């Protein structure tokens, strides 16, 4: 149940909130929101959320970005 709520929240963000941001360009492939979806689907709500938060913290102006799939 928690997994479903998290996934719906991320999808809501992608559809309604992300387009409102200026310079909405993720440095990583897949994007941080897609990474979060993949991590939650693969590892569950708790571990997947933790992985997503770590990824979002790495996504900053000083990071190189690049290809970083869920492992």
Swiss-Prot record:
Topological category with respect to the lipid bilayer: Peripheral membrane protein
Database matches in SMART domains: Haemolytic
Keywords: Cell membrane, Membrane
Domain of life of the organism encoding this protein: Bacteria
Residue spans crossing the bilayer: none
Annotated Gene Ontology cellular component terms: plasma membrane
InterPro entries per the UniProt record, alphabetical: Membr_insert_effic_factor_YidD
Localisation: Cell membrane
Keyword ATP-binding: no
Family per record: Belongs to the UPF0161 family.
Described purpose of this protein according to its UniProt entry: Could be involved in insertion of integral membrane proteins into the membrane.
Protein name listed in UniProt: Putative membrane protein insertion efficiency factor
């Amino acid at each position: 149940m928690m997994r479903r709520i998290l996934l719906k929240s991320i999808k809501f963000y992608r559809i309604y909130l992300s387009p409102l941001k200026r310079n909405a360009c993720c440095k990583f492939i897949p994007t941080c929101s897609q990474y979060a979806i993949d991590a939650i689907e693969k590892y569950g709500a708790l571990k997947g959320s933790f992985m997503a938060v770590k990824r979002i913290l790495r996504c900053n102006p000083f990071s190189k970005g690049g290809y970083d799939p869920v492992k």
